[in-house]
Amino acid sequence: KDTDTDAEGWIVINSLRGGAAAGGTRMRIGVTKDEVLALAKTMEIKFTVSGPPIGGGKSGINFNPRDPRKKEVLNRWYAAAKPLLKTYYGTGGDMNVDEVHEVIPICQDNEILFPLEGVVKGHHKKNQEGTDQIIKQLSKGVPLIVTNEKLTPIVEKKYSVGDLITGYGVAEAIFHYYNIYGGDVKGKRVIIQGWGNVAGAA
């Protein structure tokens, strides 16, 4: 529970397979512990199928994302989560939480090198030089603005790699399915449940 607002949140780590776990931070009115538990399990399945070979995790905060105190809540959230985020848990943006404009700078304000620092340390187990190199690459690549019109829906919107990468992965997975099993994606219909971080980019 937050000290200054009615915000309440949970971090769920389904397992520390491979030495680490990861999953984004979401915020909305009505987030529950059971929802975060289910999402952490789903992240575990995602990583099992697509890699890296780590455990699933998730952060969820029951709070109105339109409240003007949102950034203060996120600041206290990441300050409280710092021991995990520095050692074996990694996070990012999710529903109503922007990776580039909120997660990365707020983590850095709390002396967390990057929101995935815990995954780099827990899973990759590099020496300090190797850890610094990976963090540097992530810090440069995730907020990088995508300018190739074949990779972004609207160049003028200045979407970052972090905004688009999950949806891009879903779209590529569909193309690969048809390459492996035959058929053609043309003429196929899709059902989109929600229009969040994944579907919006896909």
Predicted regions and their residues:
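Glycine-rich Rossmann-fold phosphate-binding loop(s) that bind the pyrophosphate
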Residues: 194-196
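N-terminal Rossmann-fold NAD(P) dinucleotide-binding loop
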Residues: 199-200
